[in-house]
Regions:
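Bacterial N-terminal signal peptides that target proteins for export
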Residues: 1-9
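C-terminal subregion of chymotrypsin/trypsin-like serine protease catalytic domains
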Residues: 31-37, 57, 61-101, 190-204, ...
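Core beta-strand residues in small-molecule sensory/regulatory alpha/beta domains
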Residues: 42-45, 233
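Chymotrypsin/trypsin-fold serine protease catalytic domain
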Residues: 128-220, 255-256, 262-270
Length: 276
């Protein structure tokens, strides 16, 4: 009970920061095997030794073997893992199933060896350093090609060339799907399906990529609770440009995604991965 209480205290704390952290890609379709490198992150919250689909923490992606060959690296957001030590959680589990809520729960679970996050996480709201890694045993991820990371300054180069705004991206993740204008407000459902949806880049700052997920305005899909740490792919490629960090509480307007091509992001990622 103490472990559960600490976990929910951590969740409530996250909900109090200036924007709502985002824990499935809605407005799209079941992903099937389009993005097999996108996985779901779990923790054994009730301590029963069995992982349920409802113990989903976040989404993330397989980024390849570590530079030293010691681990397979699962990339996610810092806020997906930073709460764990204070809640007594010492291990995470990753599944690359495209559905994690069947009767047997997620299958092919890989238990972490360790996990880490950017030590500067949450120190600066302008650059949240919202990057984390879950370190899996070397060679444990098989038959799945990793995502590609972007070169340094990739998005700045697109902006300088005048081609950034409106660039097509693909959103992929697990988690909740919102239904708006319901009695009592927005309602959320969870079926544990990995989904993919289309998006377009709206803007860029030093640390963030923004896109508009107002479906009535754009026709695009969006992200919601369950998607934290999920990757944004440059459409038609395996290159990811950012990971999901936060958005509005109704999962209806803007979304904030942490860039992977900046000096600060690369400083952390370079501790674990060979960078382009």
């Amino acid at each position: 009970m103490r472990k559960k209480a600490l976990f929910w205290a951590a969740v409530l704390l996250l909900l109090l920061i200036p924007f709502t952290t985002v824990f499935a890609a809605w407005g799209g379709e079941p992903d099937g095997n389009q993005h097999p490198m996108v996985g779901a992150l779990f923790a054994d919250f009730d301590g029963d030794g069995a992982i349920s689909g409802f113990e989903l923490v976040c989404s993330g992606s397989y980024a390849g073997p570590s530079a030293d060959g010691a681990y397979d690296v699962f990339l996610t957001a810092a806020h997906c893992v930073a709460w764990a030590p204070s809640a007594g959680i010492t291990q995470f589990f990753v599944s690359f199933d495209n559905e994690v809520l069947d009767s047997d729960g997620p299958t092919n679970l890989i238990g972490s060896v360790d996990f880490d996050w950017d030590p500067d996480f949450a120190h600066d709201s302008g650059d949240l350093h919202d990057l984390g890694v879950v370190l899996l045993p070397a060679g444990s991820v098989t038959g799945i090609a990793p995502v590609q990371l972007p070169p340094a300054g990739y998005l700045d180069d697109l902006k300088a060339a005048g081609t950034l705004k409106g660039t097509a991206i693909e959103l992929v993740g697990y988690g909740l799907v919102p239904t708006w204008q319901q009695p009592g407000g927005t309602q959320f459902s969870f079926d544990g399906v990995r989904r993919t949806a289309a998006g377009t880049i709206k803007g860029l700052t030093q640390a963030w990529v923004y896109f508009n997920q107002n479906q009535h305005a754009t026709g695009d899909g969006g992200l919601c609770f369950g998607d934290s740490g999920s990757p944004q792919f440059l459409a038609g490629t395996t290159m990811i440009i950012s990971i999901t960090s936060g958005g509005d509480p109704n999962c209806r307007a803007n979304n904030y995604n942490y860039r992977l091509d900046t000096e600060n992001a690369r400083a952390f990622l370079g501790q674990y991965l060979a960078l382009p």
